[in-house]
Amino acid sequence: MIQKSRPALLQHQDVGDRVETLMLQPVIKAFLCGSISGTCSTVLFQPLDLLKTRLQTLQPSAHGSRRVGMLALLLTVVRTESLLGLWKGMSPSIVRCVPGVGIYFGTLYSLKQYFLRGHPPTALESVILGAGSRSVAGVCMSPITVIKTRYESGRYGYQSIYAALRSICHSEGFRGLFSGLTATLLRDAPFSGIYLMFYSQTKNVVLHSTDQLDAVLVPVVNFSCGIFAGILASLVTQPADVIKTHMQLSPVKFRWIGQSVTLIFKDYGLRGFFQGSVPRALRRTLVAAMAWTVYEEMMAKMGLKS
């Protein structure tokens, strides 16, 4: 009797494994779509991220009362580091964004399927889903984010990603790979939550206000809604981004958030919390809008609802 029941048990396990595999396939597709969309947007808009980092870390003592604008800094980088200098830090950016955006979209898709079960999210649900998905991706990719920020700042002479990892672990310990993680989550989780809320709500209003939208115009509508949502979300989370940058570049000086807020205000004043806001708003808005547009188009081609 025992021998007869074993094949049935194995057969039941095989069916369970197959069902589990089928359930995972859409998540893998969402991960791949997110990774591809993140790669495209990262390569295009990397110069804006570099300029944002440089603007946030300019020393006031070196420039006196004279403000350095984005255009002046752009010309300085091109003159001293060549045009390719604008793409400095591209390697860690790609290493971070390819899996990072994929993890975000994969997690978001899974949460939507589990909690929403097909119905569109409310404004509050969008905030929670976006913030939760971004938190998962942020924790997973924190070490690469630290390396990327230091690459872009121009203060560190890392020869490779591996050399950077080894140097940070040697000088700061394993904890150094998670410098500024709290500030990163305080910046990214609200950004993603606010962005997803504005994006989904704006898109619903636009789509419901038109009887029949031409399929060719759908990507344009998605991109436009993404631009609007990105601008609002970027402005709200700008101070947290400045704090995160300082904590990752100077972890000895900026040890915790409260201390960082005090030091930034002392050195730069209230304006210091909004340094680099223009390139960041441009980049985050364009990156998010393009990533969502490409992601939704690819998911539609695969027959999946994003």
UniProtKB/Swiss-Prot annotation:
Predominant cellular place of this UniProt entry's protein: mitochondrion
Native source organism of the sequence: Ovis aries (Sheep)
Name of the protein: Mitochondrial glycine transporter
Disulfide links within the chain: none
Function as written in the Swiss-Prot or TrEMBL entry: Mitochondrial glycine transporter that imports glycine into the mitochondrial matrix. Plays an important role in providing glycine for the first enzymatic step in heme biosynthesis, the condensation of glycine with succinyl-CoA to produce 5-aminolevulinate (ALA) in the mitochondrial matrix. Required during erythropoiesis.
GO biological process: erythrocyte differentiation; glycine import into mitochondrion
Catalytic activity entry: glycine(in) = glycine(out)
Membrane topology: Multi-pass membrane protein
GO cellular component: mitochondrial inner membrane
UniProt record similarity statement: Belongs to the mitochondrial carrier (TC 2.A.29) family. SLC25A38 subfamily.
InterPro entries: Hem25/SLC25A38 (IPR030847), Mitochondrial_sb/sol_carrier (IPR018108), Mt_carrier_dom_sf (IPR023395)
GO molecular function, one term: glycine transmembrane transporter activity
Compartments, as annotated in UniProt: Mitochondrion inner membrane
Gene: SLC25A38
Keyword Mitochondrion: yes
Keywords annotated in UniProt: Membrane, Mitochondrion, Mitochondrion inner membrane, Repeat, Transmembrane, Transmembrane helix, Transport
Solcar repeat ranges per the UniProt record: 25-114, 121-205, 217-301
Coiled coil: none
Transmembrane segments annotated in the record for this chain: 31-56, 89-115, 127-152, 180-203, 221-247, 276-294
